Curated annotation (Swiss-Prot):
Entry keyword annotation includes Cytoplasm: yes
Gene: Tsga10
Interaction with HIF1A, as annotated region: 556-688
Function summary: Plays a role in spermatogenesis. When overexpressed, prevents nuclear localization of HIF1A.
MF (Gene Ontology): structural molecule activity
Tissue: Predominantly expressed in testis, in spermatozoa (at protein level). Not detected in Leydig cells. The N-terminal 27-kDa fragment is also detected in liver, while the C-terminal 55-kDa fragment is also found retina, brain and kidney (at protein level).
A GO-annotated cellular component: sperm principal piece
Name of this protein: Testis-specific gene 10 protein
SUPFAM superfamilies: Tropomyosin
Region annotation Disordered: where it falls in the sequence: 656-684
Main location: cytoplasm
Compositional bias annotation for Basic and acidic residues: 670-684
Length: 697
């Protein structure tokens, strides 16, 4: 039993093992019960035999008492007769014989007393043995009944435990199925949440970009309005100047020739500026080529992303295989969590660097806008350059989005690393490759920033040239102020001013058209923002619903965990009950063994009692032999006594015959002697008959 109990937790089917143990225990208890019944039957038979022997011994004892009383009566009668008889030598011999018979009688009497004491002791022993046997029999019968009741109770409990175990197995299977379905639902919800998070991130990026564009457009509008106000003020000033210039036309006509020379110089400078613009266009073409290279790298990144998705699918397949090794990987997850914390810190540092780069880009934009204020002549070309720069910024933002998506994918990869540590090395190599690619992208961003700095330097050079031109214009204006005398020149300058006024009005119309276009684009952007807000609200509602579903699933998981804990508690209770039942069975087996030991002791006692009975029988046989010897001695004594009586009769007869005559009157006195002589004969006849009956018995 101890071996079975120690090996029971290692075996796969404890219920079948417990059932087999219960069946074996029932069989063993039934066998023990049958053996006990057989032993009780044998013990009852033995007691019946002992009781029969006791009855026979009591009947023999009663008969011996009767014979002893008869012998005492005869001895007393013979003593009386001998005392009445006269004294003679034959009477002395008879007295000697009587004394010897009395001594033998005393010896026989002492033997009878000893036999009575032994018989009383045997009776007491038999009574004690009978009482102990009856008590043991009653105790054994009660014990057998208790064992039968316990066996029935154990059968009922075993059936109940089997039913409970079947119910528990069914509930466990159902709970496992529900857990699997819930795990699948949780995986689906997690995948959907990941997708929704990615979409939300993309929408947030788009929203941020649109907000930035709106802020830029609002700034442009404010700047344009300010420029319009400045142009209007300039127009007012120009009107005033025209009034002044009409007065000074005569003085300025003389200096028109000098201004024509200066205009030729300005044309040459304009050609130089066009050459610079050609160089800038070439630089823009080189930037386009670099953008094409970046697009190629982006396509390569997309291919890498596709490979990563395939690897993620393979990892999901590997996850199914790695669910069995989750318990082994929990220890390694802490180390990977630390590494992930370090990687997250590095990513935060990179994010701060990206923010700094964005701030630098914003500063570059502000500087470009300041340059756009100063460079009204090269505004269109610079606007094209700005559009290209914005395209590059969009591409940079796209690259940032790609980097963020790659970071999210890296997070997913790290989560997969938590679940499957065996593929960690491969994923780390891939992560290193992606980091190298990120480094290459960073280098490309640095090159783009360097190109932006070059463009800034070129713009600064252009600003310097513009300042030089402005200084020249100022010098020209000073010269024009000195040339107030030439009215003809002033009229030409008036025509030029009118031409500039027309161009300014054209610029105003173009700016107004641009403002209208910007307003329309603003409205479109507002509509897009409203639509995106609606989409974001829908996504938030979906997220709320998903969160509510997740909370419901969590509550279901908690309820299922509670039910599993209850089931485990029930299993533990059932195991405790089984253990207690096994302990009770062991105790009952120990009690059965104790009963067996008691039976062995009772058997030993019975054997000892049987030996004592055999000894008593031997003693009884010896006593019977002693009785036979005493009876023979009594027979010999009776025979001698009869001979003595016959001799006494002969002597009395001879004396009677010799004294017949004188003794006739005394016949009356002899009659009692005859009666006395006849009475012992009759007593002897009776004693002989009793001896014959005793021998026949």
């Amino acid at each position: 039993m101890m071996r079975n109990r120690s090996k029971s937790p290692r075996r796969p089917s404890p219920t079948s093992r417990a059932a087999n143990c219960d069946v074996e225990l029932l069989k063993s208890t039934a066998r023990d019960r049958e053996e006990l019944k057989c032993m009780l039957e044998k013990y009852e038979r033995h007691l019946a035999e002992i009781q029969g022997n006791v009855k026979v011994l009591t009947s023999e004892r009663d008969k011996t008492f009767l014979l002893y009383e008869q012998a005492q009566e005869e001895i007393a009668r013979l003593r009386r007769e001998m005392m009445k008889s006269c004294k003679s030598p034959k009477s002395t011999t008879a007295h000697a014989i009587l004394r010897r018979v009395e001594t033998e009688r005393d010896v026989a009497f002492t033997d009878l007393r000893r036999m009575t004491t032994e018989r009383d002791s045997l009776r007491e022993r038999l009574k004690i043995a009978q009482e102990t046997a009856f008590n043991e029999k009653a105790h054994l019968e009660q014990r057998i009944e208790e064992l039968e009741c316990t066996v029935h109770n154990l059968d009922d409990e075993r059936m109940e435990q089997m039913a409970n175990m079947t119910l528990m197995k069914e509930t466990i299977t159902t709970v496992e199925k529900e857990m699997k379905s819930l795990a699948r639902k949780a995986m689906d919800t997690e995948s959907e949440l990941g997708r929704q998070k990615a979409e939300n991130n993309s929408l947030r990026l788009l929203y941020e970009n649109t907000e930035k564009d709106l802020s830029d457009t609002q700034r442009h509008l404010a700047k344009k309005k300010y420029e319009l106000q400045l142009t209007q003020e300039k127009i007012m000033c120009l009107d005033e100047k025209i009034d002044n210039f009409t007065r000074q036309n005569i003085a300025q006509r003389e200096e028109i020739s000098i201004l024509g020379a200066t205009l030729n110089d300005l044309a040459k400078e304009k050609e130089c500026l066009q050459a610079c613009l050609d160089k800038k266009s070439e630089n823009i073409a080189s930037l386009g080529e670099s953008l094409a290279m970046k697009e190629k790298t982006i396509s390569g990144m997309k291919n890498i992303i596709a490979e990563m998705e395939q690897a993620s699918r393979q990892s999901t397949e590997a996850l199914i295989m790695c669910e069995q090794d989750i318990s082994r990987m929990r220890r390694q997850l802490d180390e990977t969590n630390d590494e992930l914390g370090q990687i997250a810190r590095e990513r935060d540092i990179l994010a701060h660097e990206n923010d700094n780069l964005q701030e630098q880009f914003a500063k570059v934009k502000q500087e470009n806008q300041a340059l756009s204020k100063k460079l009204n002549d090269t505004h269109n070309e610079l606007s094209d350059i700005k559009q290209k720069v914005q395209d590059t910024n969009l591409e940079v933002n796209k690259l940032k989005n790609i980097l963020k998506s790659e970071e999210s994918e890296n997070r997913q990869i790290m989560e997969q690393l938590r679940k499957a540590n065996e593929d960690a090395e491969n994923w780390e190599n891939k992560a290193r490759q992606t980091e190298a690619e990120n480094n290459t992208l960073k280098l490309e961003l640095i090159t783009a920033e360097a190109e932006g700095n070059r463009l800034k330097e070129k713009v600064d050079a252009l600003n310097r040239e513009v300042e030089q031109h402005l200084n020249a214009e100022r010098s020209y204006k000073s010269q024009i102020a000195t040339l107030h005398k030439s009215l003809v020149k002033m009229e030409e300058e008036l025509q030029k001013v009118q031409f500039e006024k027309v161009s300014a009005l054209a610029d105003l119309s173009s700016t107004r058209e641009l403002c209208i276009k910007l307003d329309s684009s603003k409205e479109l952007l507002n509509r897009q923002l409203v639509a995106k807000d609606q989409e974001i609200e829908m996504m938030e509602n979906e997220l709320d619903s998903a969160r509510s579903e997740i909370e419901l699933l969590r509550s279901q998981m908690t309820n299922e965990r509670i039910s599993m804990q209850n089931l485990e508690a029930l299993l533990v209770a059932n195991r405790d009950k089984e253990y207690q039942s096994q302990i009770a069975l062991q105790e009952k087996e120990s009690e059965i063994q104790l009963l067996k030991e008691h039976l062995c002791l009772a058997e030993n006692k019975m054997a000892i009692q049987s030996r004592d009975v055999a000894q008593f029988r031997n003693v009884v046989t010896q006593l019977e032999a002693d009785l036979d010897i005493t009876k023979r001695q009594l027979g010999t004594e009776r025979f001698e006594r009869e001979r003595a009586v016959q001799e006494l009769r002969r002597q009395n007869y001879s004396s009677n015959a010799y004294n017949l005559g004188p003794m006739k009157p005394n016949t009356k006195c002899h009659s009692p002697e005859r009666a006395h002589h006849r009475s012992p004969d009759r007593g002897l006849d009776r004693s002989l008959e009793e001896n014959l009956c005793y021998r026949d018995f």
